[in-house]
Design a protein with these regions (language model features):
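C-terminal cap of thioredoxin/glutaredoxin-like
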Residues: 10-16, 20-41, 124-219
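Extreme N-terminus of proteins, especially the signal/transit-peptide cleavage junction
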Residues: 2-12
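A broad, low-specificity signal for short, low-complexity segments enriched in glycine/proline
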Residues: 6, 73-74, 149-152
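Structural alpha/beta surface segment adjacent to cysteine/selenocysteine redox centers
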Residues: 20, 27-133
Length: 219
């Protein structure tokens, strides 16, 4: 069993519930990666069915929000992309319109789960897929695009794509979805540490602090 050398504690288990269409998961990716590295935490990515869970847990999908909230959402994205110095298209070409299937982004999440189940660190793949959608005008709902992104990121794209609809991956996706609802996840990304939720990339500083306090054995 692994322990952190400074305290003898087991490494923190950090669960990230999100969808592969979240601009906030994309924007928070580098910060989250740095936090995980500094605290030597174990990060488990948990893509889940956002469209199914969020209406049941109190969240409001962007498309159904009143116009003032939608316009403020765009304003916040613009502020954060400038503040973080990250490329982001406010209206990405391949973000779905109302006429597209509701499960358009599930396949990318399934690919991330497949990579984790193969024992790989799937964070780079996840961030590359999100960057493809939000910064590079790439259609991550397209299998060949996902394969290309995976290959470019050092993964075996065809092998992962072949596993996307496997029984093990689908079972994990359903389990993530059930767990997200049970935990009261109402937005993405939501990080969970020792049962405590941290919603949104703008709460990562609180997660950072919680991990530091945990390492010191405090509350």
């Amino acid at each position: 069993m692994n322990h952190t050398p400074e305290t003898g504690q087991q490494p923190a288990q950090l669960h990230c519930f999100y969808s592969l269409s979240s601009p906030w998961a994309y924007l928070g990716g580098p910060q989250l990666q740095d936090i995980v590295r500094r605290h030597r935490a174990h990060l488990l990515l948990k893509p889940f069915d956002f469209q199914a869970v969020v209406p049941r847990t109190g969240g409001i999908p962007l498309r159904t929000r009143p116009e003032p909230r939608r316009s403020y959402h765009a304003l916040e994205l613009d502020r954060w992309r400038r503040y973080l110095g990250m490329p982001l298209n406010l209206v990405p070409r391949h973000y779905p319109s109302d006429g597209q299937p509701p499960d358009w982004n599930k396949h990318a999440g399934w690919m991330v789960i497949a990579a984790q189940q193969q024992g790989q660190d799937a964070f780079a793949l996840s961030h590359a897929l999100l960057a493809g959608l939000w910064a590079q005008e790439r259609d991550i709902a397209d299998t060949s695009t996902r394969i290309a992104i995976a290959n470019e990121s050092g993964y075996d794209g065809p092998a992962l794509a072949a596993l996307e609809q496997s029984g093990a991956v689908q079972a994990a996706y359903r389990a993530n979805t059930d767990e997200a609802e049970a935990l009261g996840v109402f937005g993405a990304p939501t990080l969970v540490l020792d049962g405590e939720r941290f919603w949104g990339q703008d709460r990562l500083m609180f997660l950072d602090r919680a991990l530091a306090v945990r390492a010191q054995g405090g509350d």
